[in-house]
């Protein structure tokens, strides 16, 4: 783990809890309520990558509903978990099931020295690259989240395949 990254970010930014972060990405009322199927409401999907074992399932999907309650349980896991800023119909994270994109995420791995972060933030502050809405420490690098003003619909009738 690259300890200098959260230390560096902590000097310049306030930290959000996972619940605060995902509530900002998926505002209250955007996701389906737990136990209800609502027309026009969809869910986020968390994919938990499980330890590799022969002849076993290597991933588990979790449905994230509007109460975000499942986040607390997922945070207890030592497994790698992915939650994209996209809502889906159903349990599968495939393009055909994508319904709305709430943010664009850029994954920057390979940040091995603090001067890489310093250079990145210099470029942001001086307008060479856009400043993200959120910066997330991933454990091996950072994710830059650019939250959209309005979610982009992904329905088949309006998305060019």
Question: Which sequence ranges carry the predicted segments?
Answer:
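Short, conserved phosphate-binding/catalytic loop or strand-edge motifs used
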Residues: 135-150
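Helical (often loop-to-helix) elements that flank the catalytic cores of nucleotide-handling enzymes
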Residues: 114-126, 148-161
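Active-site-flanking beta-strand signature of metal-NTP-handling nucleotidyl enzymes
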Residues: 101-108, 144
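Pocket-edge structural micro-motifs
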Residues: 85, 108, 137
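Catalytic micro-motifs at enzyme active sites that drive phosphoryl/nucleotidyl and oxygen chemistry
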Residues: 89-96, 121-139
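Conserved aromatic-histidine-acidic binding/catalytic patches
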Residues: 94-98, 136, 154-160
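DNA replication initiation on ssDNA origins
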Residues: 1-103
